């Protein structure tokens, strides 16, 4: 859009001419107004000034306005009135103004860009901001710091090379001793001097040490090469941007770079698939090599207890998930409790993400890598000093002795200076890093617990309507400053390439401990111990700093828990012990499968167990904590583990679960799911030998159980309920006197008019009732009922419900009779169970009939006045909610109380049902309910008791969601009548609660949630969103004004430097990906040949090499699915944390942290693929290279490195000069075109050209033919060079 539309104006009508004196006077007046505007910072519109004489307005084909100068016969995009209404320069701009000649435009794929009509150019950067200069300064500062880091790496290389020379000298000396069988001049101990076995062992150790040091030296060399390559790339990026005019790309070049990035991204995606396939092949080859290593006589043992072929017996007894082992009421209560826990964990995850986003700014990107190199350099010097101290000076000459002593003194001085510098410089940074790791460990544990809760919720029922939002509520993860398809995390976050970092805090503590030991030796003036390195290592402390135990660059060191905690500074607890998940409430069954990786977490401290107090707890979580307190009163101090084993055999899983450590089995380590002991004595699996009988004798409190028999007689249409016996009812209630008795009461809910009860017995331990009842009911109605059996204690005239059992008849098989033991849920764990004084239940049927008749009469009047009401929907949703249905015993209590009310007690439907609601409707609906109340007479003492009880019940309901998974129609007070409801169904016909329910009598009006069948009856003020994360917030949602929802682009836009860094980052990733694929392919071929030939050396290397084991562990299919899903969640959470951190950047301010992460990406070390050694073991007679040869190799390496640096610098300068000359010679600016400029891919470009000195740059070519006849239509095409972006 930088070109000016050239049109002939002879056919256009000129604008009417003004008189000359009027025009002159008008111009003077406008100049005065302009001066006043600059002084007062006023603003004027174009409508305040007319067009000058001879100007006209027209529109282009795309609607863009341009202006015609009839006098000069030219066209321009600039409004001639801008010189009166806009500032003349950037210094005169106020706020977000642009001076005259500048225009802000927008392109969908690129975003905002700016047009300079005067210079006829476009640029990506905002000319009003100085962000580009800040970026250039940050890049220069980082290159200086990276140069220091590179010097540390080179010094580490020199130190390790000296250690390698000493190890080679020791190996050659031992090899000569073994060959000559003479020990007269041996410098080893007296024991090894006369023992050939010890001498042979020392030789093996020395050979292994040489091999390990060579491997470490190779790692350092690769690390140096990687850092140099990254620095060369950053230097080339800076030089290229500086070579541009104003250091900016125009829009055509930006578009070309964007297209090139998308092409590279496609190549990366396809390359990652190839890498994953190679990784899976390596896992298979490694497993095959491991099998070959086993002896043939142990083949049977391998098949029986192989780590690759796991045998799990859990599937023999696994029923259809956790929810199937619970009946209706217990399952609903467990689901509601699990939902609360899930919601709290989600809040905790959001809080941890926010803390991590705040913590990122405290740690300088790339600083941790520099600190790690500095500490590793200190450790290398410590090890070299230890090697020098182990050298015996008896056989050395005087000159050699002086050189060794001088080297020792120099190393001691360097170490002392380094210790002081580290204590003052990196102490705070390491503390911040340790806090960050602590938060990351907490986040990992929280994600793990959340994933387990999701699995539990999904396994409760196949009819469950619970939806788990796996997506983030943070919106799009792409950076707001970029309109490209690739986000910041897509380019600069590669979770596969990042290797497991070395614990820098551990390295620092080890260095400090070594320094303290050195100081203690100096204070006590202890002479250094000289002798054999093996014996010296045995005499040293646990911190092995001898030459036998060199620290690998790629292998993380030992855990700090191995060292004496008293000698260290106070440290944070481990991640798994520092975070205890929010303690689980008393459960009916911890029916959650436990993955092997999470079955044995470290014990959590008491302070961490109470961690939920630190969070923002709501009333629902407070109720859960109250339940925990009640459980503790029963002397059950052991926590209920979140990952308790699954017990699918139990008809009613245990409430008082055993601790996890008591349920663990040593023989079930290879199983994917643990199985607990059978609860019922009649359980088939309990006698089949699947469970261990010893678990029944563990110290625990016995469960209260009831044996119930069920049989349905189809011909008579009668359900036979047999209440046989009970067991250990003292676990529910302790008798207060000797005359206490207990009986069972049963009812079919809902709409139960009468209840059946057994005789009262005084035996609470093993009462035998043997009562059988026949309940006439049709089969269709039976399938919609739920049998509720309550355990009632009676002391004199006082009765108290102490437990309940609820059995869903939808799961009952009418063709078979059952006799099962059911666990009794104690009333102590139900918030609504209170002791009530009930006179008697003898007149239950008569009182219920009177109450039903009164209610039906009122219902008929109410139905005539209003067909639908929000109260009905409130009643329905509350009575079908999970907590309400879970609290079925209180509903039975209400029915019993209503049966005892006098005849003058007349309560309408709305009053009773509104009191039973969870008090979730708005004030308008409550006022409407109060208007429909019918006047009642004064209540007796029993009615007052009912009001008090219902008020207590009103405070207990906390579930605000609507449950539609019931297998029976919702219970209502008016449904106690036997009249059929012939009103039509007012809900969506796609919802069918049960096939046995007749739609002619089913009415369900729901308007309390944002589901497809529960919409508001009026005009909804919000649009419907399926699967909304928080539906209750959308009930009375008001539309936000458009001004509030409009996206404001007040952020810092991308600069040309950002764009070039993104392009080079993509090419660097592609280069290293190709390098990894080549190494993996070579490794696969070698291992495959070794597997076919059964080479023991290759098999030993594949099994023992730690680097190879870490590599294949990433793609091991034997890894449990939960762990793979956890890794995906961690990757997703990293993107969310980045998004959160972006939102914390103030509007209009640059994101310094993100830019620092960009430039540190090029020098960050990724995952290295192990290389097979040329020789797996050294021969005894082979001589190792001497010191002179090593010096020559080091000199050659240094010369090669210097040559590469000089060649790369010269190449960058030459290409920059060539580009500058090409830009000057072109002298033309690409014009705006309706179609994108075609891009010709460079066929000979290679991603490695930026660091390889011999690679020739691809010369820019012009694909389009320039026509001399049509200069106005002249266009330039761009060729993308993989190393230096876009060239004209």
From Swiss-Prot:
Gene Ontology terms, cellular component aspect? apicomedial cortex; cell-cell junction; cytoplasmic side of apical plasma membrane; Kibra-Ex-Mer complex
Domain called WW: residue spans: 49-82, 96-129
Superkingdom in the source lineage: Eukaryota
What are the TM regions of this chain, as residue ranges? Answer: none
The segments labelled Disordered in the record are 1-55, 515-584, 856-888, 905-942, 964-994, 1213-1277
Point to the regions of Basic and acidic residues compositional bias.
Answer: 1267-1277
The cysteines joined by S-S bonds are none
Q: What are the Low complexity biased-composition ranges?
A: 1-15, 28-40, 534-552, 565-581, 872-884, 1233-1265
Entry annotated with the keyword Cell membrane:
yes
Which residues, by range, are in coiled-coil regions? 143-170, 197-232, 333-461
Query: In which family does this protein belong, per the annotation?
Result: Belongs to the WWC family. KIBRA subfamily.
What does the function comment of this entry state? Answer: Regulator of the Hippo/SWH (Sav/Wts/Hpo) signaling pathway, a signaling pathway that plays a pivotal role in organ size control and tumor suppression by restricting proliferation and promoting apoptosis. The core of this pathway is composed of a kinase cascade wherein Hippo (Hpo), in complex with its regulatory protein Salvador (Sav), phosphorylates and activates Warts (Wts) in complex with its regulatory protein Mats, which in turn phosphorylates and inactivates the Yorkie (Yki) oncoprotein. Kibra acts synergistically along with Ex and Mer to regulate the Hippo signaling pathway.
Task: Name it.
Answer: Protein kibra
**Annotated organism of origin:** Drosophila willistoni
The gene coding this protein: Kibra
């Amino acid at each position: 859009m930088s070109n000016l539309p050239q049109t002939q104006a002879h056919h256009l009508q000129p604008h009417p001419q003004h008189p000359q004196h009027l025009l002159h006077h008008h111009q003077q007046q406008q100049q005065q107004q302009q001066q006043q505007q600059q002084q007062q910072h006023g603003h004027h519109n174009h409508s305040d000034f007319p067009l000058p004489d001879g100007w006209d307005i027209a529109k282009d084909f795309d609607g863009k306005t341009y202006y015609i100068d009839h006098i000069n016969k030219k066209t321009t995009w600039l409004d001639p009135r801008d010189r009166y209404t806009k500032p003349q320069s950037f210094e005169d701009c106020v706020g977000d103004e642009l001076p005259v000649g500048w225009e802000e435009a927008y392109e969908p794929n690129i975003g905002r860009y700016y047009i300079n009509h005067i210079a006829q150019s476009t640029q990506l950067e905002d000319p009003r901001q100085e962000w580009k200069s800040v970026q250039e300064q940050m890049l220069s500062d980082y290159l200086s710091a990276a140069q220091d880091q590179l010097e540390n790496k080179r010094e580490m290389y020199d130190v390790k090379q000296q250690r390698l020379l000493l190890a080679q000298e020791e190996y050659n000396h031992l090899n000569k001793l073994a060959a000559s069988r003479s020990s007269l001049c041996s410098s080893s101990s007296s024991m090894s001097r006369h023992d050939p076995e010890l001498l042979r062992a020392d030789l093996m150790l020395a050979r292994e040490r040489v091999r390990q040091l060579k491997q470490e030296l190779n790692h350092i060399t690769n690390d140096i090469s990687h850092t140099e390559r990254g620095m060369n790339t950053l230097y080339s990026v800076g030089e290229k941007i500086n070579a541009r005019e104003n250091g900016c790309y125009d829009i055509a070049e930006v578009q070309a770079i964007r297209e090139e990035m998308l092409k590279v991204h496609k190549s990366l995606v396809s390359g990652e698939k190839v890498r994953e396939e190679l990784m899976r092949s390596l896992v298979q080859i490694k497993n095959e090599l491991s099998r070959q290593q086993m002896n043939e006589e142990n083949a049977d043992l391998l098949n029986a207890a192989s780590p690759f072929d796991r045998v799990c017996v859990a599937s023999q007894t696994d029923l259809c998930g956790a929810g199937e082992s619970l009946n209706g009421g217990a399952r609903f209560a467990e689901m509601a409790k699990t939902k609360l826990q899930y919601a709290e964990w989600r809040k905790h995850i959001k809080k941890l993400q926010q803390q991590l986003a705040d913590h990122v700014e405290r740690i300088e990107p790339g600083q941790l890598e520099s600190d790690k190199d500095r500490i590793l350099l200190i450790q290398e010097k410590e090890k070299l000093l230890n090697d020098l101290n182990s050298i015996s000076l008896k056989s050395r000459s005087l000159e050699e002795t002086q050189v060794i002593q001088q080297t020792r003194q120099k190393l001691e001085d360097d170490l002392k200076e380094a210790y002081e510098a580290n204590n003052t410089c990196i102490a705070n940074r390491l503390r911040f890093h340790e806090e960050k790791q602590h938060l990351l460990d907490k986040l990992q544990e929280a994600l793990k617990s959340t994933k387990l809760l999701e699995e539990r919720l999904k396994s409760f029922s196949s009819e469950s309507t619970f939806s788990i939002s796996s997506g983030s509520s943070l919106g799009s993860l792409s950076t707001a400053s970029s309109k490209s398809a690739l986000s910041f995390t897509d380019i600069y976050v590669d979770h596969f390439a990042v290797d497991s970092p070395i614990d820098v805090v551990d390295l620092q503590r080890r260095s400090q401990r070594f320094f303290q030991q050195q100081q203690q030796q100096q204070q006590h003036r202890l002479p250094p111990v000289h002798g054999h390195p093996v014996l010296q290592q045995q005499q040293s402390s646990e911190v092995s700093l001898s030459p036998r135990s060199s620290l690998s660059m790629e292998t993380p060191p030992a855990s700090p828990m191995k060292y004496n905690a008293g000698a260290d500074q106070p440290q944070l607890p481990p991640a798994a012990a520092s975070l205890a998940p929010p303690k689980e409430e008393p459960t009916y069954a911890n029916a959650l499968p436990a993955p092997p990786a999470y079955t044995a977490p470290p014990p959590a401290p008491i302070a961490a167990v109470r961690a939920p107090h630190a969070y923002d707890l709501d009333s629902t979580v407070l109720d859960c904590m109250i339940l925990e307190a009640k459980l503790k009163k029963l002397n059950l101090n052991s926590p209920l583990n979140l990952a308790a084993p699954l017990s699918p055999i139990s008809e009613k899983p245990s409430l008082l679960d055993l601790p996890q450590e008591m349920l663990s089995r040593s023989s079930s380590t290879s199983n994917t799911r643990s199985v607990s002991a059978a609860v019922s004595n009649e359980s088939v699996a309990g006698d089949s030998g699947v469970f261990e009988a010893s678990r029944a004798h563990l110290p625990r409190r016995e469960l209260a159980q009831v044996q119930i028999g069920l049989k349905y007689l189809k011909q008579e249409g009668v359900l036979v309920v047999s209440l046989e016996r009970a067991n250990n009812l003292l676990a529910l209630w302790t008798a207060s006197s000797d005359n206490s008795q207990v009986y069972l009461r049963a009812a079919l809910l809902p709409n139960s008019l009468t209840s059946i009860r057994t005789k009262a017995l005084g035996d609470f331990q093993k009462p035998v009732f043997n009562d059988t009842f026949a309940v006439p009911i049709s089969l269709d109605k039976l399938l919609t009922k739920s049998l509720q059996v309550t355990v009632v204690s009676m002391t004199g005239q006082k009765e108290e419900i102490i437990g309940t059992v609820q059995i869903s008849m939808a799961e009952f098989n009418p063709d078979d009779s059952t006799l099962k033991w059911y666990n009794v849920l104690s009333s102590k764990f139900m918030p609504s169970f209170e002791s009530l004084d009930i006179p008697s239940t003898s007149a239950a049927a008569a009182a219920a009939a009177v109450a039903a008749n009164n209610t039906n009469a009122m219902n008929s009047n109410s139905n005539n006045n209003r067909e639908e009401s929000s109260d009905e929907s409130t009643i329905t949703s509350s009575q079908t909610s999970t907590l309400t249905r879970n609290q079925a015993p209180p509903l039975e209590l209400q029915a019993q109380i209503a049966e005892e009310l006098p005849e003058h007690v007349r309560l309408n439907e709305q009053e009773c049902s509104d009191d039973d609601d969870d008090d979730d409707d708005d004030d308008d609906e409550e006022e409407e309910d109060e208007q429909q109340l019918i006047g009642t007479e004064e209540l007796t003492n029993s009615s007052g008791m009912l009001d008090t009880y219902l008020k207590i019940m009103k405070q207990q309901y906390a579930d605000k969601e609507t449950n539609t998974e019931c297998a029976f129609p919702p219970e209502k007070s008016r449904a106690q009548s036997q009249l059929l409801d012939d009103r039509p169904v007012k809900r969506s016909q796609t919802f069918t609660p049960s096939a046995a329910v007749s739609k002619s009598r089913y009415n369900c009006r729901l308007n309390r949630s944002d589901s497809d069948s529960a919409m508001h009856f009026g005009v909804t003020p919000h649009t419907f969103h399926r699967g909304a994360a928080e539906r209750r917030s959308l009930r009375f949602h008001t539309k936000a004004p458009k001004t509030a929802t409009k996206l404001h682009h007040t952020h810092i836009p991308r600069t040309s430097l950002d764009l070039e860094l993104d392009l080079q980052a993509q090419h660097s990733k592609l280069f290293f990906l190709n390098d990894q694929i080549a190494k993996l392919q070579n490794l696969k071929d070698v291992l495959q040949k070794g597997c076919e030939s059964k080479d023991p050396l290759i098999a030993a290397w594949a099994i023992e090499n730690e680097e190879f084991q870490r590599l294949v562990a990433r793609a091991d299919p034997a890894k449990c699915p939960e762990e793979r899903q956890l890794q995906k969640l961690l990757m997703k959470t990293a993107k969310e944390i980045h998004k959160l951190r972006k939102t914390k950047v103030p509007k209009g301010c640059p994101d310094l942290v993100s830019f620092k992460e960009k430039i540190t990406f090029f020098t960050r070390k990724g995952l290295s693929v192990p290389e097979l050694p040329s020789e797996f073991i050294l021969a005894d007679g082979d001589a190792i290279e001497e010191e002179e040869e090593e010096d020559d190799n080091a000199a050659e390496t240094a010369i090669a490195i210097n040559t590469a640096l000089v060649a790369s610098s010269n190449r960058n300068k030459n290409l920059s000069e060539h580009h500058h000359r090409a830009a000057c010679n072109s002298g033309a600016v690409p014009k705006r075109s309706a179609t994108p400029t075609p891009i010709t891919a460079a066929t000979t470009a290679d991603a490695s050209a930026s660091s390889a000195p011999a690679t020739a740059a691809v010369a820019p070519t012009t694909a389009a033919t320039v026509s001399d006849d049509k200069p106005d239509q002249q266009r330039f095409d761009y060729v993308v060079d993989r190393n230096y972006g876009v060239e004209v």
